[in-house]
Amino acid sequence: MFTRAATLAAFTIACALSQTPAANHDLGFEDTPMLPGLPYHVHDDRRPHPALVTPSDVPGGPPSDAIVLFNGKDLSAWTAHHSDITRGGGSGTAPEWKLENGYAESVPHTGDIATKEKFGDCQLHVEWAAPPEIQGASQSRGNSGIIFQGRYEVQVLDSYNNPTYADGQAAAIYGQWPPLVNAARKPGEWQTYDIVFEAPKFEGGKLVKPAFLTVFWNGILIHNRKESMGPTQYRQVAHYSEQPAEDSLVLQNHNSKVRFRNIWIRRLTGYDQPEK
């Protein structure tokens, strides 16, 4: 038989329970199945949240986490580079390229330029233009290159009504893979490359993961995570050899007056990075 005191205690407990907030499932769960190969449940409330990145206010502009390599003012992020020094890196001397009207233009016979910083996996945005005056043909017309880690080249070339070998035209992974389509603009018009580069991985001197490239040319996908056969070679088959995990980005000087502007890069990391 309930006493008055027992009844009052039960009422008090019931009121307290009714005021306990329910689990907020909008923020996640811990009673759902585990994701295969991961230490997290489906919709896990303990999973790290992605870092916040602020997009640019203008199309093609650098987001808040980008490293601006060229802003139209100077080449302070670059050094002169000659291929007889190393595949990556530079000479330590200032580039001799021309700066004008917000762009950098390669000056024939002054060598390539290489970034002072070194990079592994990355996202690159670069805008370029072949010379407006048509000179030469095939590989002699507006030739340059974007060379990741000083080894893996995406070709720059005036490919507007300019026949050449397919794996050497603009946006080719040079000597290996032609682009899926030719998205070339006319000579002198600005063009864009947006490239995701995945660096190769080595363990004990052996290749365990090749390099991959995803390339958008003027907004059009022309390489979809395409595997590189190895460092770029001319008239040879590429082969991998052990290399540093990070190395410089190189802009090639092929003795054509190619222009570049608005160059920025983002270091890429994996999923589930610790929150800062």
Which residues make up each language-model segment?
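Hydrophobic alpha-helical segments
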Residues: 6-7, 69
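Positively charged n-region of N-terminal signal peptides that target proteins for export
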Residues: 1-5
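Bacterial N-terminal signal peptides
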Residues: 7-16
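Carbohydrate-interacting regions of secretory-pathway proteins
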Residues: 19-276
